[in-house]
From Swiss-Prot:
A GO molecular-function annotation: ribosomal small subunit binding
Quaternary organization: Monomer. Binds 30S ribosomal subunits, but not 50S ribosomal subunits or 70S ribosomes.
Superkingdom of origin organism: Bacteria
Upper lineage: Bacteria, Pseudomonadati, Pseudomonadota, Alphaproteobacteria, Rickettsiales
Family (UniProt): Belongs to the RbfA family.
HAMAP family reported for this sequence: RbfA
Name the UniProt record assigns to this protein: Ribosome-binding factor A
Gene3D superfamilies on file: 3.30.300.20
NCBIfam families, per the entry: PRK00521.2-2, rbfA
Location(s), subcellular: Cytoplasm
Keywords, alphabetical: Cytoplasm, Ribosome biogenesis
GO cellular component: cytosol
Role description: One of several proteins that assist in the late maturation steps of the functional core of the 30S ribosomal subunit. Associates with free 30S ribosomal subunits (but not with 30S subunits that are part of 70S ribosomes or polysomes). Required for efficient processing of 16S rRNA. May interact with the 5'-terminal helix region of 16S rRNA.
Length: 127
């Protein structure tokens, strides 16, 4: 029987871990970043590297920020090349992966589900 989900290889997991560490370091220092990101606390929720190790999809979630989603995406995309250069200096590979940023909707979805469950339990209590 075939597996429904494909597991990441050791190399994919190792590269994702290194990229995560480098991104955290860059975000803490604020080096080489768009100025809009200085006062924007971000959490890197997960990093998924493609099987060919050429693309790293980085999922993030902002906390308590005045910036809009589009502002954050623009700032991250403006900083993308500097981040990739920093990652290139940290890894010893022939190619450095392209960095793609994605908003992580997991937290938003969890809040929606929680609200639905609460409203459903309230309806059950009233019936």
């Amino acid at each position: 029987m075939k597996k429904l989900t494909k597991t990441n290889s050791h190399r994919q997991q190792k590269l994702a871990s290194i990229i995560n560490e480098v991104l955290i370091e860059i975000l803490k220092r604020g080096k080489m970043l768009d100025r809009r990101l200085f006062d924007c606390p971000l959490t890197i929720t997960k990093i998924v590297v493609t099987a060919d190790l050429k693309i790293a999809n980085c999922y993030f979630f902002p906390f308590n920020t005045k910036l809009t989603f589009n502002d954050i995406m623009d700032a991250l995309n403006n900083s993308k090349h500097a981040i990739r250069n920093f990652i290139t200096n940290k890894i010893n590979m022939k190619f450095s992966p392209e960095i793609r940023f994605h908003y992580d909707y997991g937290f938003d979805n969890a809040i929606k589900i929680e609200k639905l469950l609460k409203s459903s339990s309230l309806k059950d209590k009233t019936n």
